[in-house]
A protein has these predicted regions:
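Histidine-centered catalytic micro-motifs
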Residues: 71-78, 113-119
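A short, N-terminal "cap"/entry segment at the start of jelly-roll beta-barrel domains
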Residues: 17-57, 137-157
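Bacterial Sec-dependent N-terminal signal peptides
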Residues: 1-22
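Short, conserved beta-strand element in jelly-roll/cupin
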Residues: 62-66, 76-91, 130-132
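Short acidic-glycine-tyrosine-enriched beta hairpin
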Residues: 95-112
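N-terminal post-signal-peptidase region of extra-cytosolic proteins
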Residues: 45-48, 63-69
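Ligand-binding loop in jelly-roll beta-barrel domains
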Residues: 90, 111-136
């Protein structure tokens, strides 16, 4: 029995590695690449976890925004879902009051509704964005408007 166990023990890592090559594995844990400074202020990193293709109708992108970074107003032709996995942020739809997002929150931006999301002044935010199609950028989010939201939603110390 002992003689059979030893060879199997040493072969196990190779079997596991061989199995992984049969699958298309991605990880949202990787930071991604620094995004070009377009349609936002501050710093952002994007990890395109999954890209839509002929067999998949949506994208999943992990986005990390450093504290005090903002994303401009935009909309999508189909609903977008944001899943906050780290930090805290802000979210606002046109014509509605802004809200503060925290780890574990999931929010759905309805199709064709202008909205923005960003990190808080104090904390980075990381979220998974699940969406289809292109993003349509509609308006620059002014620093004064972001600061007003930050002051309104500031957590008491």
């Amino acid at each position: 029995m002992k003689k059979k166990f030893v060879p199997l023990f040493f072969m196990f890592p190779f079997v596991v590695l061989a199995q992984n090559s049969q699958y298309n594995l991605n990880s949202y844990l990787e930071q991604g690449t620094k995004a070009p400074n377009t349609h936002y202020l501050g710093e952002a990193w994007l990890n395109r976890v999954l890209q839509a293709d002929e067999n998949l109708s949506f994208n999943i992108t992990k986005a990390t925004f450093s504290a005090n970074s903002t994303l401009d107003w935009h909309k999508h032709s189909e609903s977008q879902v944001l899943v906050v996995v780290d930090g805290s942020g802000y979210y606002q739809e046109k014509g509605k009051n802004p809200i503060r997002l925290k780890v574990g929150d999931i929010i759905r931006a309805p199709a064709n509704v202008e909205h923005w999301h960003a990190a808080t002044k104090e904390n980075d935010v990381t979220y998974l964005a699940i969406y289809s199609g292109e993003t349509q950028w509609t308006q620059v989010l002014l620093r004064e408007d972001y600061d007003r939201v930050a002051n309104t939603l500031k957590v008491p110390q």
